[in-house]
Design a protein with these regions (language model features):
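Conserved phosphotransfer cores of two-component systems
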Residues: 50-51, 78-86
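Conserved phosphotransfer microenvironments
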Residues: 54-80, 93-94, 100
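Non-catalytic signal-transmission and effector/linker regions of two-component phosphorelay proteins
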Residues: 1-24, 197, 204-209
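Conserved beta-strand segments of the P-loop GTPase G domain that flank and frequently precede/overlap
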Residues: 21-22, 56-61, 90-93, 113-115
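Acidic, metal-coordinating helix/loop segments flanking the phosphotransfer/catalytic sites
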Residues: 39-55, 63-65
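Two-component/phosphorelay signaling modules centered on CheY-like receiver
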Residues: 20-41
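Cysteine-centered metal-binding/redox modules
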Residues: 121-211
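Output/docking surface of receiver
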Residues: 37-40, 93-127
Length: 211
């Protein structure tokens, strides 16, 4: 088990934690006894039950796909557990990933923030938590992204972004990905308006001219 400077405080009976952060990168140092970092999913669940944090935060950085799936499973458990499900669950992502956000939505995650690979600090954590609003809701972040964003695994750690409206034959990247596919502007994209295939479970999308 990974040990932290706060991991053994099972007898703590003071105020509840302001937040509990699960970040397996291990690059965070709490500044207050009411802030806590853990470096594993097991520790996170244990401390979430024991310490009753006001907010639970899980960070997804660049990592193997299997580790990402494990963190999603943690989110599922946190929102199903009767002792942790009422605490707002915030997920920090290093990039937009529609498939992952859809999994987090199903898991019951409340909020999402995109922070790239920013090094976290106590002040930054508090700023993000206090500033959470409707635009950070998982549903809102999910609906912004193009439904044709697909991901093909290259290896255990990397995926290629492709356009489902073009039969997954067009690789996406650069400005087009960030300015169109990952924003509300995807609704004006010619591939979105005239797809060669429909996204799973959705009605056919047609252009304004009915073509």
């Amino acid at each position: 088990m990974i040990q932290t400077k706060h991991a053994s405080r099972k007898g703590q009976t003071g105020k509840s934690l302001r937040y509990l952060l699960c970040d397996i990168s291990g690059r965070f140092e709490p500044k207050s006894e009411r802030e806590e970092w853990v470096g594993s999913t097991t520790q996170c669940l244990d401390r979430a039950v024991e310490a009753k944090p006001r907010t639970i935060v899980v960070r997804f950085g660049p990592m193997p796909i299997r580790e990402r799936e494990t963190l999603v499973e943690l989110c599922v458990v946190l929102k199903r557990n009767t002792r942790t499900r009422n605490a707002p669950l915030l997920v920090l992502l290093h990039e937009k990933h529609r498939g992952l956000i859809e999994d987090l939505k199903r898991a019951g995650v409340d909020f999402i923030k995109f922070i790239a690979e920013t090094r976290l600090s106590s002040s930054r954590m508090i700023e993000m938590i206090d500033g959470l609003g409707p635009d950070d809701r998982v549903d809102r972040q999910f609906e912004i992204l193009c439904p044709y964003l697909h991901y093909d695994a290259i290896d255990a750690c990397h995926e290629m972004k492709v356009c489902g409206a073009y039969l997954d034959r067009m690789v996406l990247g650069g400005k087009w990905l960030h300015k169109v596919c990952e924003t509300e502007h995807h609704s004006t994209c010619k591939y979105f308006l005239n797809p060669r295939v429909q996204p799973h479970g959705q009605e056919p999308v047609t252009s304004c001219g009915g073509g």
